[in-house]
Amino acid sequence: MFGFKTTKNKKRVRLLVVAIGVMIFFMCLSNFSSIQSRQSSSTDTPLQQNGKHQVIRVLETQPSININNSENNINNENINNNQNNNPNNNMDNNNKNNNKNNNIDNNNNKNNNNNDNIDNNINNNNNNNNNNNNINNNNNINNNNNIDNTDNNINNNINNNNININNNNKPSYKKPEKKPPLSSSQIFFNSLPPHIQKQVVIREKSNYAQALQYDSYGIVPAKDFFDGLDAVFETKPNYKISTVRKLFNIENLNSNNNNNNNNNNNNNNNNNNNNNYDINNYNNINIKEDDKFENKNYQNGDKNIMYSDYKGIDYGNNNNIEEIERIKEELKIELEKENVNDIFKYRVTIVTQTTVDRLYKVAAMAERWRSPISVSLFIKSQGDIDKLEKAISANKILATFADFHLFYHNNTRYPVNNLRNLAIRNALTEHVLLLDVDFIPPSHLHDHIAHYINLNYLNQDDSLNAFVIPSFSSNLQPKDIPDSKFEFIEMLTKNKIEPSNLKVCPKCHSPTDYTRWMTSTEPYAIEYHWIYEPFLVYNRSQTLPFDERFKGYGFDKNSQIFGMAAQGFTFSVLPEAYIVHINHPTSRWDGPSLDDQQWDSLRVVCDLLPEIRKRYAKGYKVDRLFDEPTTENCYSNDHW
């Protein structure tokens, strides 16, 4: 019996042990689940800040959770939280609430999530909380989770006020805006003396995109064909150390002395033979600024006087009464010395272009011409400006008759047509004579041309007429070029002078008919042929500007003459007129060869010819206007 009871007790003990083990297992399982649940709802991240550990709780918000508006008053605030699970979250708050119980006190909002109280204290001063999540409280709380107060939903972007929490270890300051680098033209402009800067106009350009226009043949010119059109400096030659020609306006010499307003609008009849000037009332002569001068009124005789001052006054300040009075005194002397018809003696301006190393050629031209010259200078550096100022301060003739206008480029081929247009725009008369800087005119040329301009004016001939000036070349020195046609022809017969380029390009000048010119005593008309490129006198207001797509060498001038012929110009050779090119060694140019430059210019010509035909064909479709190449055979050598 005893043995039986012992066995039965052992079984009971075993069952009790098993029951206790099962209970312990389920208790452990329950505790484990509770811990795991808490860990999934919150993460404690220690942060070392100012020598202390601060616990930051990161709320993992679900995209769509209904929030009772009575329990959580989230008032139109956008919370933007760019979370990248960075444990180093620096919160920089003016309130500096370091709550290790994960309680952040919020005056407006209490949000209970998984029994964790998060009280966010956001004061009205929009303090920045930088938790390495850069909380930016400029009335803005962005959380990439839109909280819509109307529906009490968190929708991944909350509008109105935004807090930016950026998980970057960057300070919360606004990065200064990067200024674009200065172009070379701006750098050059900043280096100019102040008195020159005042006279400069910058026109920013970028012309490389024009290469697309020439892609029709599958070949685009080299990049330097378009480079460099970065800025244009257009200046009047009012350097303080130079002498410059000034313009004066005699309006009504019997008017009130206080009427000193540079008025161009004279209702007087324009008549060059006005003899009613009252010299004693010279005090009413008004100084007229160059840039306000309208050449066409000057040409028609509206009493504008061009006057040269030889003492280098700065005319930019008309408030200097002493200077003005002195100028008027000198003008009175000039008026007394000259015949009234001489007041309007300047009818033509030479327009030319060059670089500073050839200023001596401009001086040689001015010595013979003794009339206005408008010069465009290709400027490459501040040193060129210095050379220009030295030249015009040292040479009285250069300073008296030449007006200089600056054109600055980067690295480019010589911008010949840009320079020509600049010189033409700034010419002091409507009629211009286009010359290269290597040419020397005879001393009588201006008056000879002016005579025929006056004939057209008196006859009220407004037709499109251009005067051809026969061109020659020689190895003589400028001082040895004869001033009379008789002596000039003698040198022609001795081969000391010869017609220009007849051997190199017969078509370029042969229409001038040099044989006929040698015996002519009256102007004679000539017939235009393609690629003819004479040196012309014409009214600039009647023509279009030179095409500035041309750079370097080739077709820049004859394409302009073709446009004038298509427009309807007639060409007349003047009997006593001539110019002589002084031969010189070929200039060195660091760039493409002349053949390459000419090839690139040919591409421009082949685009330009159809444009001109379309412009002047008056609605008719024509293959050619003269004997120029058609579009199909534009690249044929037979036409060049």
From Swiss-Prot:
It comes from the Eukaryota. InterPro entries: Nucleotide-diphossugar_trans, Xyl/GlcA_transferase. Residues 36-640 are extracellular. Disruption phenotype: No visible phenotype. Cells exhibit normal developmental morphology. One of its GO terms (biological process) is protein O-linked mannosylation. It is a single-pass type II membrane protein. This is Glycosyltransferase-like protein gnt14. It comes from Dictyostelium discoideum (Social amoeba). The lineage of its organism: Eukaryota, Amoebozoa, Evosea, Eumycetozoa, Dictyostelia.
